[in-house]
A protein has these predicted regions:
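Intrinsically disordered, low-complexity regions enriched in Ser/Pro/Gly/Gln/His and often acidic
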Residues: 2-3, 210
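Short, Lys/Arg-enriched N-terminal segments with co-localized hydrophobic residues
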Residues: 3-18
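A solvent-exposed interaction/effector surface
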Residues: 18-229
Length: 229
C-alpha cells in the first residue's frame, strides 16, 4: 500500500523528535522525581531567564509576557539548524519545560495567599553549547524575526547545589501540603532549608496548565538545603 505524503511527513517528524536530546529523559533524576522527598545535588546549568514581579495569573501581565520572550529565544536557538547561523557543537534538543524561581521580601519560602508580592525569575534550560555570545545572537534574531522585544532576557548559569525535591501533583495553591512533607523529611534527616537571595524556591512545570485539569498538573518543587547545626 502506498504511503501518503502526509503520513511520510508524520513519520519523518517522529524520527526527528526521537533523535532530539530530551533533558527530561536524559536527566530523570532532576525532572521526574517521585512523589516523596529526595535529596539531590544539582550541577550548574545554563538558562535563558527573565525577571519580574507580581501575580503570575494576571491577564496580560509581566509573567505571561516573560514566557513569550523565553520561548521566542529558546526556539530561535533550537531552529538555528534551519538557517545560515551555525552554533559550534550544536545538536537538536526538545525545548525543556518552563521553570521558575520564586521569593517574597521578608518571607522564607512562599506565601501562596499573597501572589501580588511575588518576585520571580522565569527560566528555560539550554544545552551546554549555548554560550553568552550565542544567546546574544538568539535574542537579536528573535527580536528581528518575531517583532518581539526580547531585551528583557538574560543568560544565567545557576548552580543549585544540594537540594530537596518532590513531584507535586495538583493545583499550585495545594503546594503547601507538599512543601510540608519536604520540611518533615528534612527534619527527620538532620537537614534544613537554606533560602537566601541566591538560593530560592524552585518549580519545574511539566504540564501545560491550559490543556489539563488542575488535579493532573505535575510540578517539581525544589528547595535549597543544608545540614542542620
Amino acid at each position: 500500500m502506498e504511503v501518503s505524503l502526509a503520513k511520510k511527513w508524520e513519520i519523518f517528524q517522529k524520527g526527528m523528535r526521537a533523535m532530539a536530546f530530551d533533558f527530561k529523559k536524559e536527566y530523570k533524576e532532576f525532572y521526574l522525581p517521585k512523589n516523596k522527598p529526595q535529596i539531590v545535588t544539582v550541577p550548574p546549568a545554563n538558562y535563558i531567564a527573565v525577571r519580574g514581579k507580581g501575580d503570575p495569573n494576571e491577564e496580560g501581565g509581566a509573567y505571561k509576557a516573560a514566557i513569550g520572550v523565553l520561548y521566542a529565544v529558546a526556539y530561535t536557538i533550537k531552529m538555528s539548524k534551519m538557517g545560515d547561523h551555525r552554533i559550534e557543537g550544536y545538536y537538536d534538543f526538545v525545548v525543556p519545560p518552563l521553570e521558575g524561581f520564586w521569593w517574597q521580601e521578608g518571607v522564607e519560602g512562599i506565601d501562596y495567599s499573597n501572589k501580588s508580592t511575588f518576585n520571580w525569575i522565569s527560566v528555560i534550560r539550554m544545552p551546554d553549547y549555548v554560550t553568552k555570545a550565542e544567546f546574544d545572537w538568539a535574542v537579536a534574531e528573535a527580536t528581528r524575526k518575531k517583532k518581539l522585544d526580547c531585551s528583557s532576557a538574560e543568560f544565567l548559569t545557576i548552580d543549585e547545589g544540594e537540594c530537596v525535591q518532590i513531584m507535586h501533583l495538583g493545583a499550585f495553591d495545594d503546594e503547601p501540603a507538599t512543601v510540608a512533607l519536604m520540611d518533615e523529611y528534612l527534619k527527620a534527616n538532620s537537614y534544613e532549608n537554606d533560602f537566601s537571595k541566591t538560593r530560592l524556591h524552585h518549580e519545574i512545570y511539566l504540564t501545560d496548565a491550559r490543556k489539563a485539569e488542575k488535579d493532573k498538573w505535575k510540578t517539581v518543587i525544589r528547595h535549597p538545603i543544608k545540614k542542620s547545626e
